[in-house]
Regions:
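A residue-level signal for conserved active-site and pocket-lining positions in enzyme catalytic cores
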Residues: 13, 77, 178, 190, ...
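PAPS-dependent sulfotransferase catalytic core
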Residues: 1-59, 84-85, 90-101, 199-250
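Short, well-ordered loop/turn elements at secondary-structure boundaries
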Residues: 1, 47-48, 66-69, 171-173, ...
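Conserved aromatic-histidine-acidic binding/catalytic patches
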Residues: 5-9, 70, 174-182, 228-235
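Non-transmembrane alpha-helical segments in soluble domains
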Residues: 18, 22, 187-191, 241-244, ...
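PAPS-dependent sulfotransferase catalytic domain
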Residues: 40, 55-62, 67-73, 80-200
């Protein structure tokens, strides 16, 4: 079969989509083992020979796959994605022991637990600020423009218009851009490709401690001590708002 590539942006209901894709592919041996970009810092994130590539991965190697591939991603209201990511890390951090929290790989989880929202997003060392901005600051724009999970710094020196233009060019290399609240189109496209019904609605994994449909963004803003900090956080969606509206409009959503 032609390869399926699911570029899973964190906190966009991707775990349920990945599980559905695994079921469709059938053979676990046909699923690429690379699920996170940090697994292969120097190696291939899209090793040849698999039917499914799915995860928080860079996609600089997309053009090495057969031209009849089906590559897609799913977007979510960028404010809700930011808030959901924050609360997910907070939940994860609370489940860790002090010893586990002290490990270097859990620096982000330790920070979200110990710091105020103001300090988590806008204080700390330059290295910490790079981490925060790479994961939260107009992530869709950076990911589509650079094809990298942590590609934001590669856009340094570009104007907002240039960043958006590069992101649109990147998106044009994909066969589908979908919205998390409207997965019917993805269901239809996958059903047509596999020749059998595909159901994605309701396959929510890692929903966290929130009522289904509850908005996370207001809850995150309420954690800020400074209105100025809350306003700065809103700027983390300024480009993504424009990009998402453009892409979903042009994609027929």
């Amino acid at each position: 079969m032609s390869p399926i590539v699911f570029l899973h942006i964190p906190k966009t209901a991707g775990q349920g989509i990945h599980a559905a894709l695994e079921t469709l592919v059938g053979d676990p041996g046909r699923v690429s083992p690379v699920r996170v970009h940090t697994q292969c810092r120097a190696g291939s994130q899209m090793p040849p020979g698999y039917d499914l590539y799915s995860g928080h991965i860079d996609w600089t190697e997309l053009d090495t796959l057969p031209p009849d591939r089906f590559a897609f991603t799913v977007l979510r209201d960028p404010r809700e994605r930011i808030a959901s990511f924050y609360f997910f890390l907070l939940k994860e951090s609370r489940a860790l022991s002090p010893e586990a929290l002290a490990r270097p790989e859990n620096t982000g989880k330790r920070a979200v637990l110990e710091l105020s929202a103001d300090d988590y997003f806008f204080a700390g060392t330059p290295g910490w600020q790079t981490f925060v901005r790479d994961h939260y600051d107009n992530f869709y724009t950076a990911y589509l423009a650079t094809r990298r999970m942590r590609g934001r710094q590669r856009l340094g020196g570009l104007s907002e218009a240039e960043r958006l233009d590069r992101a649109r060019q990147g998106a044009a290399a994909l066969q589908g851009i979908y919205e998390v609240d409207r997965l019917q189109r993805l269901e239809q496209d996958l059903s047509a490709r596999f020749g059998r019904p595909v159901t994605l609605a309701g396959r929510v994994v890692n929903a966290g401690e929130h009522v289904r449909g509850e908005r996370r963004w207001p809850k995150l803003l309420a954690r800020f001590e400074s209105d100025a900090s809350a306003a700065r956080l809103a700027e983390f969606t300024s480009l993504d708002d424009v990009l998402m509206a453009d892409l979903l409009s042009s994609d027929g959503s």
